Amino acid sequence: AYGHVMFLRIRNQVDPVSRGFLVDDFDPDFPPLCWACDEARDQGGIVIWCHNGQGMEAPIAAVLGKLDAFNLFDPFWMDPEYDIWYKLMNCGIKLPASTGTDWFICSNNRVYVQMDEKFGYDGWLEGMQKGRTFITNGPALFLNVEDKGPGDIVRFRDDRKVNVRVSWRSHYPINRLAMVHNGRVVKRRNFREGSYEGEWEAELPVDSNGWIAVRCNGVARDSYNQALYAHTSPVYLQNGKQNPYQTKDAEYFLKSIDKSEEWVRHTGRYTNDDQRNAVMEVFEKGRKAYEKLAKT
């Protein structure tokens, strides 16, 4: 119910590996995942939220700054997870895109990281933390906004237009390409016959803090019969004016916290009230953060 996380570059196993009904019908829903995230971070680890954007602790861990990346298309496209990711970024949370194949599923899902140095594990992880990624099961997709790439910040004053450049190459043809600004598709291109490579340049009006990303998909299927897709991490926009969707999306997460706390109070299984209260405290920290964002 809380969700699922993945840790990279940890020196010691973070226990417990699993709790609740995945262990047995009587195992307690304790401790919360945020505690595990803290333990991994204390070891210098990287924390990635995995294929469960609807897990109760996802918005909590994100707003409290415990996540380095957010898995999507893991193991397949699920609209609600993208919607949650978009809403989190509208709240000003910088959250790079990652992906994977899940533990028992074979697929072509991969996250690619742009690096500034010779390839190496630590440099790759640093690039992921900086948000210099795109996720894909085939197409290579690249984004440039005012000469800035994914993970970078475009700073500006007042209202203006920004130059957005997109390029792609794919072994199988893509059929749809979309520019996404603050979670809304603002420009799109359709390729009825499919496109294997190309470039696209456009001007987008911007007037507030926010983000721009690009995504593509196609009717072709990869070798595991999944529809073709790719999505970049965002380029962030910053001019000091609040993202127009911040209040609404922060309120969305406040409502989700209401439901989560109701579950903790009446459905969650705990050995004693101290455990239940400790979990409630984690959700209350998240609530305070979103209340601040909703009122800003």
Where are these regions (language model features)?
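Catalytic cores of extracellular degradative/oxidative enzymes
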Residues: 1-93
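C-terminal functional module detector
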Residues: 15, 91-97, 101-296
